């Protein structure tokens, strides 16, 4: 009888639920031991989105919280640390808030959302109203945390007040967990109330983390390491653990052995190489890790369809604004060359500023490099010194994000020059290969090229295919088909002009050796051999132009048969 496999935890960020309902769990419980062994009163973990931050925070809550279900940790690695479990498991009041849902058009609405989060967490401790250890004044203070119209001054003190009341009732200091601490700041910057939100978060944290004598320790998570002067002013007990740090490097994301175990369990080991190429490559500290969101989603697809192709799961969870801003800098020659090196799988050396404010993020190209590194669009392969890193694109998925944004920016620049666009399209329709070639070469000079290393020939051809489609997409009166079945195979691009009397067939090839003339002839021969014109002839198109176009870096050769 075939074994029933555990469910894959897509989007499950509640540790207790994951364990109770028998989802597959990649064991990261030794984070608990390392956190206790490497003591810091306030710990901030910064990692890119979708790398397991929230699940780890939920796991910490499940372990430390008073009267927690110890069965959650049965057969986990931390359960073998018997003395540690006896001393710490289920022994502390835990306050756990997540700020990831604070997204509002105005500061006032964002503040209301923060109040609702505090209200919700305070309601978990309503037994304090019956406590014999709390005075009437204490209970009135607690009631103020339940009010939906809580004053902003109370909100700023709320986590400290709740900590003090819990310690007074239980006789035990409190563990404070704050997940996605930087999301309200990101939204506030985007929507124009950044200074007000910065002040609120600074006051909240100063009360909760600096002047809180009831605090055992705190753990915060986020994507960005916000400047200490911005919201962590005077917080001398803060330990920041970023993607560059060796400590805790294996606990966010899947290691290579984690992925091999998953694939073996689900009988998908034959997909290891493609998963590694698409989703591996991040280096946190000294450990190479995969994006867990990608691995879990792709494995789930493969369980249904073993022929499923890798997709950009991670990139679809964000607008990829940092990459968009970065690509807009490509008009500067140095930046363009650096992006071309990255796309080619090479490394570049940059000084990284890990502490920024959101106001600084896009203020300079130097800061943009730091944002791309911190948020997972670039990773490091080593250091030159404390702040200077060798940077590279981690994997195929991230490379695709760059290529997509490059293409979007290219289309934008094409649309801004209607005269050049009209010249190209008229020449294409008239069979003027010299002008088509000249126009294409001018376009190529203005965009980023695909260099030889790392990239397969098919992918290079796809890139240049995309460039041509990007140009042709603005010719609204033409019917443009891409990879349309015709004759004995598929033509790269098939066009019917507005009068439907002229048809254009384009075959694209990449000249690996740089011999553009020979490769463009090969492209033309393929059109003839595979009878790509059959469909146009069937539709009554009599005037057919056949183009063989060869590309090599920033050059092309165009030949035509009329």
Predicted regions and their residues:
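Phosphate-binding site recognition
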Residues: 1-460, 473-478
């Amino acid at each position: 009888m075939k074994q029933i496999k555990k469910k894959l935890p897509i989007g499950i960020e509640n540790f207790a639920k994951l364990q109770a309902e028998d989802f597959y769990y990649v064991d990261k419980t030794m984070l608990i031991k390392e956190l206790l062994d490497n003591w810091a009163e306030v710990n901030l973990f910064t990692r890119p989105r979708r790398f397991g931050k929230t699940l780890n925070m939920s796991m910490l809550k499940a372990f430390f919280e008073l009267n927690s279900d110890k069965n959650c940790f049965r057969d986990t690695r931390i359960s073998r640390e018997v003395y540690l479990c006896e001393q710490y498991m289920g022994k502390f009041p835990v306050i756990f808030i997540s700020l990831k849902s604070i997204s509002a058009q105005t500061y006032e609405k964002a503040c209301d959302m923060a109040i609702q989060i505090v209200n919700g967490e305070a309601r978990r401790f309503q037994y304090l109203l019956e406590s014999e250890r709390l005075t009437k004044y204490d209970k009135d203070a607690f009631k103020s945390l339940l009010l939906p119209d809580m004053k902003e001054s109370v909100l700023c003190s709320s986590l400290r007040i709740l900590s003090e009341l819990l310690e007074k009732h239980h006789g035990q200091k409190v563990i404070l967990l704050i997940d996605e601490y930087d999301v309200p700041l990101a939204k506030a910057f985007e929507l124009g109330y950044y200074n007000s939100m910065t002040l609120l978060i600074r006051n909240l944290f100063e009360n909760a983390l600096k002047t809180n004598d009831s605090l055992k320790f705190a753990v915060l998570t986020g994507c960005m390491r916000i400047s200490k002067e911005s919201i962590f002013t005077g917080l001398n007990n803060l330990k920041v653990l970023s993607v560059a740090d060796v400590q805790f490097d294996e606990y966010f994301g899947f290691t290579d052995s984690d992925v091999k175990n998953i694939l073996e369990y689900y009988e998908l080991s034959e997909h290891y190489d493609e998963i590694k190429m698409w989703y591996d490559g991040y280096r946190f500290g000294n450990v190479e890790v995969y994006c867990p969101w990608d691995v879990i989603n792709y494995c789930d697809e493969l369980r249904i369809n073993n022929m499923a192709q890798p997709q950009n799961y991670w990139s679809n969870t964000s607008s990829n604004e940092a990459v968009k801003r970065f690509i807009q800098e490509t008009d500067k020659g140095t930046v363009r060359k650096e992006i071309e090196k990255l796309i080619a799988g090479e490394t570049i050396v940059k000084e990284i500023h890990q502490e920024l404010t959101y106001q600084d993020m896009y203020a300079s190209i130097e800061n943009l490099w730091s944002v791309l590194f911190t948020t997972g669009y670039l990773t490091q392969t080593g250091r030159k010194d404390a702040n200077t890193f060798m940077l590279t694109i981690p994997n195929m998925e991230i490379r695709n994000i760059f290529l997509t944004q490059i293409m979007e920016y290219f289309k934008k620049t094409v649309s801004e020059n209607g005269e050049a666009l009209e010249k190209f399209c008229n020449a294409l329709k008239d069979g003027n290969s010299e002008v088509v070639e000249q126009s294409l070469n001018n376009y190529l000079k203005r965009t980023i090229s695909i260099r030889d290393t790392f990239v397969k020939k098919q992918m290079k051809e796809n890139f240049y295919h995309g460039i041509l489609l990007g140009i042709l997409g603005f010719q609204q009166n033409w019917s443009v088909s891409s990879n349309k079945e015709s004759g004995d195979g598929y033509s790269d691009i098939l066009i019917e002009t507005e009068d439907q009397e002229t048809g254009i067939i384009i075959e694209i090839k990449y000249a690996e050796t740089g011999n553009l003339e020979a490769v463009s002839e090969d492209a033309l021969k393929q059109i003839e051999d595979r009878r790509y014109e059959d469909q146009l002839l069937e539709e009554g198109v009599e005037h057919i132009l056949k183009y063989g176009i060869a590309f090599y870096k920033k050059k092309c050769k165009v030949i035509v048969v009329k």
